Amino acid sequence: LGDVYKRQICNIPHPSYKEEKISNYLVDFAKERKLEYYQDSLNNVIIIKEASKGYEDAAPIILQGHMDMVCEKTPDCDKNMDEDGLDLEVNGDFISAKGTTLGGDDGIAVAYALAILDDDSIAHPRLEFVCTVSEEVGMEGASSIDVSMLKGKKLLNMDSEEEGIMLASCAGGCSSRVTLK
């Protein structure tokens, strides 16, 4: 997992509204493994891996994350977050970025999903990875993605706030328009 995240995802700039490169990386990942995939005009991606032998009748599982990251940097950092990959520091099991945010929200979900989809030794039902764009700026990708091809009824949102904590729900958003007279 660390290798996928460290070497590939962090090398691809993926701020909100500029997810095309990471989206295309996900499509290439699916193509290389002969997995079914969908990419829409906003660059949302769905990757489907059919069930392994013996799990064909098991209920499909939807894995969900988002591909954009919050791009912040220290005042002395001259990195162009729209164009440059991250400079990583690895200290044992810990990965951090030099002078910038790491993009762990939600790069870790993307890395986990890719590691799961890439591992043929894991027995599994049909897996459906839904990876949306522009979550950090209002869940825009999630609001407009066509999920009609999904068969799963259970979704595992992998965008949690704390390491080592499994969340039995997910963050949500709501907007209202109020007119006062």
Q: What annotation goes with each model-predicted range?
A:
Residues 1-5:
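Short, small-residue-biased leader/transition segments that mark boundaries at the very start
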Residues 6-93:
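Acidic/His- and Gly-rich active-site-bordering loop/insert found
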Residues 7, 11-15, 31-36, 118-125, ...:
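Generic secondary-structure signature for well-ordered alpha-helical cores
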Residues 8, 25, 112-115, 144, ...:
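Alpha-helical scaffold segments in soluble metabolic enzymes
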Residues 12, 16, 96-105, 165-166:
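Flexible, glycine/proline-enriched loop segments at strand-loop-helix junctions
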Residues 33, 48-50, 116, 141-144:
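A generic local structural motif
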Residues 47, 124-181:
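Histidine/acidic-residue-rich, glycine-tolerant segments that coordinate divalent metal ions
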Residues 55-126, 131, 136-137, 143-153:
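Active-site metal-coordination/substrate-binding segment of hydrolases
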